[in-house]
Amino acid sequence: MSDAPTKWRIKSARTVYSNRWITVREYQTVAPTGADALYGLVHMHNLALGVLPIDEQGRTILVGQQRFPFGRYSWELPEGGGLPEITPLEGAQRELAEEAGLKAGSWLQLVGDMHMSNSVTDERAYAFLAWGLSEDHSFAKDSSEELSVRRVSFAEALKRADSGEITDAFTLVMLYKADHLLRTGGLPEELAKLMQAQT
């Protein structure tokens, strides 16, 4: 599909707030319709990175933590922010080690350059499937995070997504994309066998 011919035009911009993770900018713009419009944009300094790990028994790993914006506990796949000076894969490898204490011998990109909430933020996301897992405690955990880690079958993780127990959008995308690839023959045979082991 082609892009729309008319783009937004920026008349002026100012930084409203900034810290090490985000910058909030306010724009005076002309919309594609020609109307003047005020636009607020949250610029993310890091990439969003996620990992769907599969162990030798066909289980994946859910990480539980208290999420500040909604004031509730959330079960998610390992995910976090990736520094801009390293590749998405390197960042995902670090997240898997930090949150789950694991490394993987095999990696497959699951999602590339996904726009997380493109009406208000420029956050971009990459996600990977990881298998051939072994322990890796070379990275210290984030001091602001108190994490719980559980291993569940891939099928059980999907059930928790279907039931609404899992609400994190990035986790839902990873689970459903992996399930689609599993059903359509888009995964390496060894990985597919692991994921189907407990279905």
What are these regions (language model features)?
Residues 23, 43-46, 55-57, 67, ...:
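Active-site segment of metal-dependent pyrophosphate-handling enzymes
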